[in-house]
Amino acid sequence: MRLRAAVSALAVPVLLLAGCGQGAGPSPTSASGAVGSAGVSDSAGSDSAGSDSAAASSEAPTPGPTVPPETAVAAPVPADQLPTATGKIGEKPAFSFPKTSPPPSLQRQILVQGSGQEVKKGDWLITNYLGQVWGGKIFDNSYDRKKTTAFQIGVGKVVPGWDVAMAGVKVGSRILLSLPPADGYTSAGNSQAGIKGTDTIVFVVDILESIPADKGGQADAKPVPLPATTAVTVSGKLGVQPSVKIGPKATEPTKAQVLRLSIGTGAKLALDDQVLVQYQAVTWTNQPAVSTWPAANAAPQNPGGKGPEQITVQKDSPFAALAGITVGSRVLLLLPKTKSAQGESPAFAVIIDIVAKT
């Protein structure tokens, strides 16, 4: 079943911030950075007095602490041992660094306390951010691009310091992070971004939205019945995982086609928009193909990394038909069979929930 190839060929890989703009942000860890499973204690601690500090071991020769699984939040370093950052949420910050050496532990400081929901592992975050080497150059920022960045935390898709430090923060917050090497790019560094294996890296992050891994389209969207001639049955309430069945009289599609199942109240999509979607698919012979929806018995932190996937409404692709569809909607995407050097891929019926525009 090659639906994932058909979809993923057009899907934007999870934005790991490494390939954005000219620089590189919190990309996935390498094999040497085996700290991607690090967690956060159930108690987020208090950030109002300064910073949170992740407990760490100091096994040589790692040039920074190794964050153990399920690390507890340690006592913060004094505030004057961390950089200061100018600006309000939405404004590009500027760092001023102290003359002291970087702290050897993961530090988090709440610069502006938000009032939204708490971020949980497995959530997708929509953010603005700026990353800079301690006392050195800026290697990436979204403010100059004037475009937010989305990524999933707690599942090993970003550097471990982000996986750990984002959890427990409230939406609407601006935070400062200081990541020693083991919590960033480890001893390997990131040569493309100009980050050495001994560098501490710091970030300001504006957390604008948090999207749970099981979030679908709008539960109160306006339903739209399928034409009877479609001979495809879609079951399940709006906003939760659906199911789809191809009837015996259904005509196999010869081109990509989108049929509305509900109309959300969000913004209309346009070509080149990036969006988060949930999808559930079957082949034209009703064989289960692929789904982004987390399993019903999945752990709360969503360790498998399932959940919304980011795609581009790209011209000359099946997703081009999503242009004009509103965020919050549910649609049925019919994909014809295709042939390639790898063989033939069957026709598919895909239920897509448009979760958010990023």
Place the predicted regions along the sequence by residue.
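Cross-family detector of peptidyl-prolyl cis-trans isomerase
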Residues: R2-T358
